[in-house]
Amino acid sequence: MAKVKCAIIGSGNIGSDLMMKLLDNEVLEVTALIGIDAESEGLKRAEKHGVKAISNGIDGLVENPDLADIVYEATSAKAHLHNSKILKDLGKKAIDLTPAAVGPFLVPSVNLKEEEVPHLDNVNMVTCGGQATIPIVKAVSDVLKVDYAEIVASISSMSAGPGTRQNIDEFTVTTANAIREVGGAEKSKAIITLNPADPPILMRNTIHIQTSGSAEAKKGEILEALDAMVENVQSYVPGYRYKAEPVVKDDIVTVSVEVEGNGDFLPKYAGNLDIITAAAVKTGEMMAKNLLEKERV
């Protein structure tokens, strides 16, 4: 079966996990892992798996533009602000896993629509917390107007690499923005905590939602919408599940979800990284299928 070539910028934890997820993909062929340190473990790992390792950053892609049609950005928000312009000039589709938010926010279970895929050139995967919590907010906002949504994402310190730590301010701003734009909340707040517990905890997310009008009066509809959304997310993130049963009282809905990683490269406790890479793969697959259909026409 024909495949669409893709490259990954960023040879750290997220880039490495993406590469492992893509090695046996049915529609995507990972052709290059791009970093800035020839001695990095990520680039050495790429070579072992037969993936071209590029150590001079995005310049390596500029020198070899035919390497990929789709490019995953797994570096930092600052880096993508620079790289996005180059990718646009090269005519590459970009899937951004940083909080840069150059392109529109995308959460596969909420707003990845087949008919819109042809028009997507640069999409932003929000943040790990956004991928885990926005579907919950959206499920409730589809039933009742959401006046306010507050999310607390708690992740293991051991799963937070340099990129995550450098982007914490951007994480809170980008996640809160996307809760409004994609989740449908009027107002929002996002908080992230790093938990140093050993053994490491799974990613846990608590979502507090205040509705306009009585949520309790529509409890059945809300619970049904939540169950359907969780099942949707599980179609590409199998380890996504309720941590506790949702609570609906008066105008408040409280939902707790946890994410166990798939263990492709990262440990299973790193569900925070796994959910965003899985969402990015799902998005790339949709883009690739669209490109392959165009070729057949």
What are these language model-derived features?
Residues 1-7, 26, 272-297:
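N-terminal charge/polar-biased segments
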Residues 1-152:
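N-terminal Rossmann-like NAD(P) cofactor-binding subdomain of oxidoreductases
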Residues 9, 131-249, 263, 267-270, ...:
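Active-site-lining helix/loop region of Rossmann-like oxidoreductase modules
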Residues 62, 87, 195, 245, ...:
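Sparse recognition of residues in long alpha-helices and their boundaries
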Residues 81, 146, 189, 289-290, ...:
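Generic macromolecular interface patches on structured domains
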Residues 250-258:
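Short, low-order "capping/linker" segments at domain edges
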